[in-house]
């Protein structure tokens, strides 16, 4: 139970100390497991929700209230398992989630927060992604409060958990075009990074979509972080070394959207201009870069030959479609094969949109 108590103490102390502890002990997986066990004790079997690349999940009020934003399917569920002050607690959480900003990057706040989310006098993260009952975007607290009251009077639902406790919930749908609204939020950063590193902005946007669906809070089970799911000790360390920096980026650093996009794009630059620079055809290179972003350079070249120079020669001797076919069918990782297909499909289907609307 030590790590669970550590989690509680971390929540009530400076997060930088907790980040340091987790970094020094490689206790991330254990921390997640302990956290999940605690959630199961409170909410019941099959009720564990933990933040992921395309899911924002936050607990509050002694873990009895939680918010879940599913960025892939486009909905928000706010629920409580406690009947004590349930309307008050749900109302408060609805207001907080509608007005939260994308600067709430404290690592442990992705598990639990015991204070009100920071609400700044700036555009909320979900602005224009959620419309109220008058079909208007929500910017001010009184708008969020009014919408919360409407939802609680018309959309409140109740179900039973596996341990026969009542769970009260409100579901809010994001607008159908919620993805493009999130793209717009980070477009300037993507364009600046694209120009700085010479990486196609359509490729950057496609990778962000498949990695996180433009969820700035994204954290994976492998501890990949942020919009581009950068791993501190691999891509993060490589980029820092290229930039003449010591060590690796912190979690808080990578949970900043601008830092994350710059780091992820810098790594794409390293893949296309250093590690895979020997590939001549730009389309073949793009396929290799996409696959390597997910699985690493060695695994990509190893699909063609154990010898890297021979692998590059083989790639250069065949057509781009053949390169894609070999990577898609012969890469040893099913995840990497699927990743290449998804990123490439999104890239092809949206290239003209990215090139015209977002330039």
Task: Give short role names for the model-derived ranges.
Residues 171-176, 246-253:
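A short, mixed-charge helix-start or loop-turn motif at secondary-structure junctions
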Residues 198-219, 230-231, 264-265, 289-294, ...:
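Short, functionally critical alpha-helical segments immediately adjacent to catalytic or ligand/cofactor-binding
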Residues 170-172, 234-242, 300, 307, ...:
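A short secondary-structure junction motif
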Residues 212-221, 237, 295-307:
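Secretory-pathway/luminal and periplasmic proteins that interact with or process carbohydrate-rich
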Residues 262-310:
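Catalytic and binding regions of secreted/periplasmic enzymes and modules that target cell-wall glycans
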Residues 5-209, 217, 273, 277-280, ...:
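Cell-wall glycan-active module
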Residues 221-248, 259-270, 317-318, 343:
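Substrate-binding/active-site groove segments that recognize
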Residues 178-181, 251-261, 334-335:
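Active-site metal-coordination segments of metallo-dependent hydrolases
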